[in-house]
Amino acid sequence: MEAERRCQAEKPKKGRVGSSLLPERHPATGTLTTMVDSSAPPCRRLPGAGGGRSRFSPQGGQRGRPHSRRRHRTTFSPVQLEQLESAFGRNQYPDIWARESLARDTGLSEARIQVWFQNRRAKQRKQECSLLQPLAHLSPAAFSSFLPESTACPYSYAPPPPVTCFPHPYSHALPSQPSTGGAFALSHQSEDWYPTLHPAPAGHLPCPPPPPMLPLSLEPSKSWN
């Protein structure tokens, strides 16, 4: 009987020792944590945010983002606009030296002048597109009606007829003459014969006159002793 009592008395002690080795739970602390979590407003984290601090405060405001600055718009005087327009008419793409020279004349900064030229080129392209847009819907026949009618030429052009040349009068071989007198007489006779040719018909051009014929024999005649 005494042994059984000792065993029953030792069982609760063993349970207490085993339970002391297990981690103790704090239900009160867990309850407090759930209350704090439920009272805080839900915060959404950005998809690309890291594991650091949240970018949003519990009140819903965003931290670290600067306020957007309002751009200052430059107003140009009529004198400045006149100078800029005249420079734009001369050159639509001025270089850095031209912009600096224009900045000294107008009293503006070089950056402001560069922006003005960019806006002016964009405005001109927009105006050109607005002018060409109504003409894009016209057909070729309607567009040709705006062109002036071409008047027919009162004179008709006919190609000239082919030029016919007569045979050269000196193409045949001439016999050699023993003296210069005979050669001179022959050349004179041939010159008299050339104008006797029939005149060229209308529309045909005669060949240019032949070059003067050189005498075939220039040696003086030998006297027989």
Curated annotation (Swiss-Prot):
Domain of life assignment: Eukaryota
UniProt xrefs under Gene3D superfamilies: Homeodomain-like (1.10.10.60)
GO CC term (a single one): nucleus
Record region (Disordered): 1-76, 197-225
Name of this protein: Homeobox protein prophet of Pit-1
One Gene Ontology MF term: DNA-binding transcription factor activity, RNA polymerase II-specific
Homology family: Belongs to the paired homeobox family.
